[in-house]
A protein has these predicted regions:
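Acceptor-substrate binding/catalytic loop of class I
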Residues: 54-62, 89-104
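Cofactor-binding loops of NAD(P)H-dependent oxidoreductases
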Residues: 1
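A short SAM/SAH-binding and catalytic strip from SAM-dependent methyltransferases
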Residues: 15-31
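Short alpha-helix
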Residues: 95-119
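Conserved class I S-adenosyl-L-methionine
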Residues: 46-83
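A short acidic, Gly/Pro-enriched loop at the edge of an enzyme's catalytic core
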Residues: 4-17
Length: 161
């Protein structure tokens, strides 16, 4: 469904809005995304967000070379076999994603009168979602060739004025 349309069908305000891994890469417009978040937050409400760092989306699937821009210059279009839920499904399809730099994420939220309370970056992911991940500590995974040199995930908390 179209998250941008949610304010047209849901008429509630919340103390917390939470968005997690793998969400904004499917969205072309973070300004509209931030409008939706602000729309549903009560004054003083908190937006909690955790996402893969845009740095990791710059690489090819095997993390051997940079393939895409860090900046949202154009949609990323790839051909994928299978589906998100079933990689062995007999299906070939194009999918479109966008790589949003962290500055775009933060600035879109600030433009909607949300105040940034915290921002953190992590050199690991809490689960093995990329090819060739290795668990270096219980519940912490890294892309071996990147190690702890680059961020894998980031999180933030923002509060609505």
């Amino acid at each position: 469904s179209d998250v941008y349309e949610l304010p047209k069908i849901l008429d509630q305000k919340f103390d917390i809005v939470y968005t997690s891994y793998g969400t904004i890469g499917w969205l072309p417009d973070l300004e509209k995304w931030a409008e939706v978040i602000s729309h549903f937050l009560k004054p003083g409400g908190k937006f909690i967000f955790v996402e893969f760092h845009p740095f990791v989306w710059m690489y090819d699937d095997d993390f051997t070379h940079l393939k895409y821009s860090y900046f949202n210059e154009m949609p990323i279009v790839e051909i994928e076999e299978g589906t998100y839920a079933n990689q062995s499904a007999d299906l070939v399809q194009n999918y479109v994603m966008w790589n949003h730099p962290t500055s775009d994420v933060i600035n879109s939220l600030l433009s909607q009168n949300l105040v940034l309370k915290s921002f953190d970056e992590y050199s690991w992911s809490p689960y093995a979602c990329f090819r060739h991940n290795s668990e270096f500590e219980k519940g912490k995974y890294r892309i071996p060739q990147l190690g702890s040199k680059v961020p894998h995930v980031f999180s933030l908390v923002a509060e609505k004025l």
